[in-house]
From Swiss-Prot:
Pfam families: KdpC (PF02669). This is Potassium-transporting ATPase KdpC subunit. It is found in: Cell membrane. It comes from the Bacteria. It comes from Clostridium botulinum (strain Eklund 17B / Type B). InterPro entries: KdpC.
Amino acid sequence: MKEFKAVFPKALIIFMIFTILCGGIYTIFITGISQLIFPKQANGSIIEVNGKKYGSVLLAQQYNDEKHLWGRIMNIDTDTFVDDNGKKLAYSAPSNLSPASKEYEALVKERVDKIKANHPEQDDKAIPVDLVTCSGSGLDPHISVAAAKYQVNRIAKNNNMKIKDVEKIIDKYTSGKLFGVLGEKTVNVLEVNLAIDGILK
């Protein structure tokens, strides 16, 4: 008991010091630095035009009409959780289906058929895999350059645009490899679609 009484005050002081340092000072310092150096990224990389917010470049938005660029399959559940007022809450997660299962095979086939039906000009050209599969998060905001270029003709036709103009928009919102060597080039779906709509210039 004596040992406890001797150690406890010291442990409590250390606990309080590190709580203040790590929970308070460190948090305030990092928040302040991030707001000073890169405020847009620190606040969620929100796209805002003329005072209206259209979404974050870091989160996918659902587009499935013929005029817009389609992103990866979004895996969102709106049936499991509700808030205190009974309003449905959306959350995303990867699918638990086995790639070898019949259910997954049928699901991918359904997606492939939809892609082919909406892109008849591509004939038997291989469909980029990211157009028929989910990402790990279920909310991936990017697709591959190949997946974006696959949709160019449909987008141009349904927006009365020239193919080269659609390609220019895609090129504008294509990010290069990290440090020039890591990963692959990716296209931000939301930015492309806002540019197609004339919101982003």
